[in-house]
């Protein structure tokens, strides 16, 4: 089924990760909502974590006009690089543009240069927030944001689309 179409309030759109417009499962894994994981509602992840993520994606629909770029804040659980591959990666795209790849946890480890500056603060906050600047087609009012995990084990908690009015908040 199709889910909500979000509209901006105070210059940004805040979407719980489970409130997708559409979900596409992977061939061997299904999107699963994990209640109470996250600061505000839940998390959503492909399960089982051992399966390929192949064609899986989450799509969010939002309305925005008179902006040509947005900042997309993707909030994930502070998952460690359990595959030991130099970080786990997801892709972000708007309106079918070429996806931007985000390695969200490459420095989230106990190496001496990261332990105090990255690892401890991130584990304490339990989330990793990455910001991706994406251009949008100004001729359209309705936009589709797609997130594709390249790696398994990524738990998405919240997505914020900043149209220019977002201010960082603890609960996001």
Predicted regions and their residues:
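Extracytoplasmic
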Residues: 1-172
């Amino acid at each position: 089924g199709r889910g909500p179409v979000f509209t901006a309030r105070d210059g940004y759109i805040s979407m719980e990760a489970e409130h997708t417009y559409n979900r596409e499962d992977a061939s061997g894994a299904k999107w699963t909502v994990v209640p109470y994981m996250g600061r505000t509602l839940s998390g959503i992840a492909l399960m089982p974590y051992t399966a390929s993520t192949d064609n899986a994606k989450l799509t969010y629909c939002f309305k925005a006009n008179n902006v040509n770029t947005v900042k997309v804040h993707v909030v994930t659980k502070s998952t460690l690089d359990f595959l030991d591959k130099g970080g786990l990666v997801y892709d972000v795209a708007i309106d079918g543009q070429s996806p931007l790849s985000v390695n969200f946890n490459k420095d989230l480890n106990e190496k001496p240069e990261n332990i105090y500056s990255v690892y401890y603060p991130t584990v304490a906050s339990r989330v990793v927030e990455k910001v991706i600047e994406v251009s949008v087609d100004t001729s359209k009012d309705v936009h589709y944001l797609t997130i594709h995990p390249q790696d398994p084990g990524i738990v998405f908690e919240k997505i914020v689309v900043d149209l220019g009015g977002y201010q960082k908040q603890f609960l996001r």
